[in-house]
Regions:
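Exposed, low-structure sequence patches enriched in small/polar residues
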Residues: 78, 215, 292-294
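Short, well-ordered, mixed-charge alpha-helical segments that flank or form enzyme active sites
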Residues: 150-156, 195-198
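Cleavable N-terminal export/targeting peptides
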Residues: 1-36, 281-294
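Outer-membrane beta-barrel "beta-signal"
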Residues: 118-121, 245-249, 266-294
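Detector for outer-membrane/organellar transmembrane beta-barrel domains
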Residues: 162-230, 239-240
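Solvent-exposed residues in well-ordered beta-strands and their adjoining turns
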Residues: 124, 174-176, 275-277
Length: 294
């Protein structure tokens, strides 16, 4: 019994000493953390690809290769994957994406590692098909999205990924305008984004985006401008523009995309990928077009 008492006292003392050696400091909000996209690799927390006001009625499986040329000798090559899954209806999706693995060459040498996993729930909250009036075609489509970023990305010590979770919510709205042989799609989005930084702090940001797309039966063109405003104002306000060309043949969608970092995202990006649309909701009031063009 005496031996157990001595062991218990020893464990209690070691716990007290271990806690005493870990200082808990009050956050200094006036000092920026530097945990921001301008000072990390291209996959740390990039500008999120915006929705265009619609969810998907198909199971979409995407695989791509992408390269980043840094403005300051920071070059990266990634394998990228994404999947959209309808939740038994075209009006709600689960989306999962990540840079599966990347190889990089930066100022302090070469390396490689896995990236962060993102998962989102995308819900249609407004659609013109829900209204049976002659002017229903003028009603825009709207979606809300809630997403989580994991802390699975590797090599925080070499400034490749944040060693912390994050999340964002956004609202997107879009409208299709039929022209002679093409459809013009205009969309906008706004939201809130947050990620943990250090010493119990977090960075909050306002998201924004505008998009214009032209869709023909076999090809589509898309241009997007977007970014977010972090509150620290220290490398945390990335702004980018993207141009995308895609083909559409029997459920397959090969594409090529270029992205240019205007501010706080010092990279050129080139992505080449393929999306396969699988109709898994047949005979459930889904459109025949796999990309839901209205």
């Amino acid at each position: 019994m005496k031996r157990l008492w001595v062991i218990g006292c020893g464990l209690w003392l070691s716990c007290m000493l271990s806690h005493a050696l870990v200082p808990i400091e009050k956050p200094t909000l006036s000092e920026p953390t530097g945990i921001a996209p301008a000072y990390f690799g291209p996959n740390a927390f990039p500008v999120v690809e915006m929705l265009d006001g619609r969810t998907s009625s198909t199971l979409d499986v995407e695989l791509a290769g992408e390269g980043y040329i840094g403005y300051h000798s920071n070059n990266t090559v990634n394998l990228f994957a994404r999947v959209h899954v309808p939740l038994f209806t075209r009006w709600a999706n689960i989306t999962l994406w990540m840079p599966v693995y990347g190889w990089y060459d930066q100022y302090d040498g070469k390396g490689s590692g896995a990236g962060d996993v993102y998962i989102s729930t995308d819900i249609q909250i407004l659609h013109n098909e829900w209204f049976k009036t002659p002017k229903a075609k003028y009603i825009p489509q709207m979606t809300v999205r809630a997403a989580l970023k994991t802390a699975s990305g590797e090599q925080f010590d070499r400034r490749r990924h944040y060693d912390c979770p994050g999340y964002f919510f956004d609202l997107s709205m879009g409208q299709s305008i039929p022209l002679k042989q093409v459809t013009l799609r205009l969309a906008g989005s706004a939201g809130f984004l947050c990620w943990q930084t250090d010493n119990g702090r977090q960075n909050d940001a306002v998201m924004y985006g505008l998009q214009a797309a032209l869709r023909h039966e076999y090809v589509s063109l898309q241009a997007t401008w977007g970014g977010y405003f972090g509150w620290e104002q220290y490398g945390d306000r990335p702004m980018t523009v993207k141009a995308r060309v895609a083909g559409h043949v029997k459920g397959f969608e090969p594409y090529i995309q270029y992205q240019y970092g205007i501010k706080d995202y010092p990279f050129h990006q080139l992505r080449v990928g393929l999306i396969y649309h699988i109709a898994i909701l047949k005979n459930r009031n889904t459109p025949s077009n796999p990309n839901n063009e209205q």
